[in-house]
Amino acid sequence: MEKRQLYSSQSQSQPLNIITNTINSRPSLLRKPASSSSQSNDRISYPPSTDSKFIQQQYHQPLLTNTDIKLEDIESSSSNNNPLKNSINNVSMQISQLNSSHHSRALLMQKRNNPTTNIRPTVKKKLDDTHKPLTSNFKKPITPISKLNTNMNNNNINNKNNNININSNNSSNSNNNILSPVQNNTISPNSNLLNSSIKFEKSNFFSTMYSSPTTITTTSTTLNNDNNNNISISSSCSNNSSFDLQQQHALHERMNKIDQFTQTVRGNLQSQFDNISEQLKPPRLSLSIQDIKTRLDFEEKNKEVEKIKLELKNVLQSLKEKEKELMEAHYKVSQVSVLKDNMERDLQQSNQMILDLQHEIRSSSLKAIQVDEKFNNMKDVTKDLDDEILRLNQLVRERDTEIESLRKENRELLEKSRSDEKVRRKLHNTIQELKGNIRVFCRIRPDFSSGQGANGSVFNIPAGTDNLVEVKSPTIDSFNGEASIKKSTFTFDRVFGPSSTQELVFEDISQLVQSSLDGYNTCIFTYGQTGSGKTHSILGDLKVPSQRGMIPRTVEKIFSSIQDLTEKGWTYQIECFFLEIYNETINDLLNTTTTTTGGNSKSNEIKYEIKHNPDTNVTTVTNMTVVPVTHPSQVYELLNLANKNRSVAKTLCNERSSRSHTVFQLKLIGYNQQSSERTQGLLNLIDLAGSERVSRSGVEGKQLKETQAINKSLSSLGDVISALANKEQHIPYRNSKLTFLLQNSIGGNSKTLMFVNISPELKDLQESTSSLRFAAKVNSCELGAARKQKII
C-alpha cells in the first residue's frame, strides 16, 4: 500500500514538473543569462548588430518572444477559489500583456531602421566579422529529438494511455544540427530568435492533482518543433492505466536530457542576444523618449515576470509539500487501518480465548467438585488405611522381633549343626570303620540264557539273609561215579540278587561317597570274569537314567551333597581324570591326542608316571589331563569320551570285552568360610578287566598277550590281598601298575569297597567260584584305620 501511494505521488507531481520545466526552459529574451565568463565553449555566439530591422529581415522572426499560455476549462475536483488556479490565471494575463510589449518594441526597432540611421554599415561589418565563427559554433552536433522519439518507441511507450511523442519537424535542422541564424551575411528582419507558444490544453491534470493519492495517473506529453520553433506541450491525465516504474524512470531520464538541451540552447541564445544587443545599442543620446519608455516598460515587465515565476515556483513547492504531507497522512491512515485490523483480529482471538477459558473454568469447576468428592472419600479411605498401617506396623514389629529371635535361634542351630556335622562325620567314619575299611559286595547278574537261574541249582541267596550266597555245583564221586550236588556258602558284607536295580545297589555305596566329601580316600572297584556285569555296574547306560551305574550316580550324589553343604558355609572345587592300564601301560582317556581302539594304541609318546606322597598319602599321575567340573553333565561328556577311547575287543566269552583296567578319580577340595576348615578327599572308581582262562577265552596273538597281562595284574592284586590278609611285612605293590596305583587305596589309608560280579550261567560256574573265593579272601583282610588327607 505504501508503494502504491508513492507511485501515485510521483505520477501527480510529474505534470507539475513539466509545467515548471517548460516555463523555466522558455527561451525568452527577458531572462538574464549566466555570466559570459562561465559560458562553456559550446555556447552559441551571435554576431553583434544594432539594426533590429536588419535582424528581422535575416531571421524572418520577431525580435522578442511571443508567448501564449492558454488555460481552457481547467477541470478540478477542488473549488473555484483554488489558489493554484488563480495563480496560473494571473501568470497567463501578465504574459499576454508582456507579449503586447514585445510587439511594440519590435515596431520601435523597425522605426530605428530608417535611411537616416548611419549604423547599418557598422552592423553589417560586425556581422561579417563574426559570421564564420558563429557558424562553426552552431555546427556542433546535438542529439536529435527524432532519435529520442525512436528510442522511446522502442521502449514500448506507445501505449494507448502512456504515450509520449517527441516529434521534430524542423526543416532547417535536417542535419540534426543547430545552425547559425546568419545567412548570406544578413539577418532576416522577419525571423524570430525564439518564438515559443506554450499551450495548456483542456485536461484532467488539475482534477487529478487534487484527487485521491491512491489514483495512479498517466501523462501524455507531445513536443512539436515546427519551422517557427513553436513548442507545444500537451498534458493529459488518465485514470485507466499506470506507468511501469522502469519505463517511468527511463522517461524521466529522457525528459531531463531534453530539459538540459533546452536550457543549453536558451543560454547560448540569450548570451549571443545580449552580445548583439550590446553591440547594436545606439548611443544614449540617439534614443528617443519613446524608446527609453519602451525599454523601461520592458524592464518592469521583465521584473514582474520574474516575480510571477518566483511566486509560481513557491506555489508549486507548497503544493509538493502539501502532497507529501497528504501522502504521509494517507500512509499513517493505512498503518492505522492495518493496526486497527490487527487489533480487531486480536480482540476476536482474545474474546474467543476468553470464551474458551470460561468453558474450561466451568469444566474445571465441575472437575473440582468431583475431585473434592473423591478427596473426601479418599480421606475416609486414608483414615482407614492409616489405622490398618498402624496395625500392620505393630504386626511388623512383632514379626521383626520374632524374626530376630528366629535368626538368633538359627545361628545357634547353625553353630550346633556345624558341631553336629563334626560329630556326624566322626560317627560316620566310626561306623565305616566298624563295618571294615575294606568291604566286599557281591552282585549276581541276571540269567540271559535258557539254563537254570540264579535261584536254581547254581547260585542261591538264603531266605532272610542279604549277605550269604550258596553255590550248588554238580559233582561226580570219583569212588563210585555217582553224581551229587556240592553246596558252598560265601559270606560278604552285602549280596545283591539278579533283580537288584542300580538305585538299590548305589544306596550302600553312597556312604563311601559321603566319606570322600568328609576328606577321606575312598576306592570302589569291580572284579569278576568277562561278561559278569562289571562295566554295567560301574558305568551303566548314561542315556537311560534308571540304568546309570555307580560313577554317574556318585557324581550326582556329590553335587547334591555340595549344594546342601553350601548352606553350612562349604564350597568345593572338583577335578577329575580318567586313565586306563593296558598291557602295563598307562593311557590318558581324556587326551584327544592319544586314542586306543580295539587294542591298537596310538600315542604321542607321552610318558605317565605314578608317584606317591608319603606325607599326604596322595597318589598322582604325571602328565595326566585333569579337568575341573562344575556340573554332572560335564562328567557325562567326559565319560562318553573315555568310553570311545577305551580298549575293547571281541572274545569267545564276550562280544565286547574290556581289554584294560580303567580308573576314574575325583578330587574334592572343600573350604568352610565360617570355620576356615579345609578338606581334601579322593574317590577312585575302578573297572578291572575281565579275568578268564586262556583255554576258555580262545584268544590268540595280540589278544593272548592282553589276556596274559590282565591275568598277571589280577594275580598281583591277589598277592597283595593275601599279604595284607596274612599281615606280612612286605606287600608286593610294585609287581604291577595296577597294584602300585592302588597302594594308598588298599594299603590301610583308604575306605575300600570291592564289587565281585558273577555270572549265573552254568558254563561260567568254575570262573564264578574262583571269583567268589578271591572276594572272600579280600573280605577276610583287616586294614588299618583310614586317616584324613592332610592339606598343604
From Swiss-Prot:
One of its GO terms (cellular component) is microtubule organizing center. Residues 437-781 form the Kinesin motor domain. It is found in: Nucleus; Cytoplasm, Cytoskeleton, Spindle. One of its GO terms (molecular function) is ATP binding. ATP binds at residues 528-535. Residues 284-423 form a coiled coil. InterPro entries: Kinesin-like_fam, Kinesin_motor_dom, Kinesin_motor_dom_sf, P-loop_NTPase. Induction: During the developmental stage. Residues 34-50 have a biased composition (Polar residues). Belongs to the TRAFAC class myosin-kinesin ATPase superfamily. Kinesin family. NCD subfamily. This is Kinesin-related protein 2. It comes from Dictyostelium discoideum (Social amoeba). The lineage of its organism: Eukaryota, Amoebozoa, Evosea, Eumycetozoa, Dictyostelia. The gene is kif2.
